[in-house]
Curated annotation (Swiss-Prot):
Keywords: Cytoplasm, Methyltransferase, rRNA processing, S-adenosyl-L-methionine, Transferase. Specifically methylates the N7 position of guanine in position 527 of 16S rRNA. PANTHER family: S-ADENOSYL-L-METHIONINE-DEPENDENT METHYLTRANSFERASES SUPERFAMILY PROTEIN. InterPro entries: rRNA_ssu_MeTfrase_G, SAM-dependent_MTases_sf. The keyword Nucleotide-binding does not apply. Its EC number is 2.1.1.170. Pfam families: GidB. It is found in: Cytoplasm. This is Ribosomal RNA small subunit methyltransferase G. S-adenosyl-L-methionine binds at residues 54, 59, 105-106, 120. GO terms for cellular component: cytosol. It is an enzyme of class 2 (transferase). It catalyses: guanosine(527) in 16S rRNA + S-adenosyl-L-methionine = N(7)-methylguanosine(527) in 16S rRNA + S-adenosyl-L-homocysteine.
Amino acid sequence: MNPLLQDYARILLEWNQTHNLSGARNLSELEPQITDALKPLEFVKDFKSCLDIGSGAGLPAIPLALEKPEAQFILLEPRVKRAAFLNYLKSVLPLNNIEIIKKRLEDYQNLLQVDLITSRAVASSSFLIEKSQRFLKDKGYFLFYKGEQLKNEIAYKTTECFMHQKRVYFYKSKESLC
C-alpha cells in the first residue's frame, strides 16, 4: 500500500476510536477495504470527474482520489461527523482534488455533470440511478460497490458486473439506460 493510503488508514483508525466511522478496528481489517475501493481501477474507463454518494469514512472516494490526483471528486456526505472527518482528511493529505458537500443526494441541486458516479453501501442500485443520473454525463458510468443483494435490487447484464471475492462491482453506462 502506498504511503498516502497508509496515512489515510492510520487517520481513519485514529478517528474510529472515538467516532465509530468504520467497522474496521485495525489495519488488517482496513487494508482489504482499501484494496476493494481501488480494484475497479483495473476495469473502469478513464475518468476525470467523480461524484461519490454517501462518502462516509471515505471509501471508495478517498483511495480513488489519492490514486487519481488528476481527477476531481465530489463527496456527498450528509452526516456531520463523517463530513468533518472528510474535511480533516482534506486538510492533512494531498487531496486538493476533492470537494466535500454536506448534503443528501436528494437535496443536492448542483447542475454539474461527471464521468463517474460511485457509491458503496448506501442504497439500492435502482434508487441511486434514479436519483443521480442527472449528474452523469451522457457517456458516463455508474460504479456501485455491491454484494450478492444486487440481484434483488435491479435487473442487470452479466457484462455490467465484475466480481472480486465477495464484492460485486456494478458498472453500468448511462447510455445503456435508454
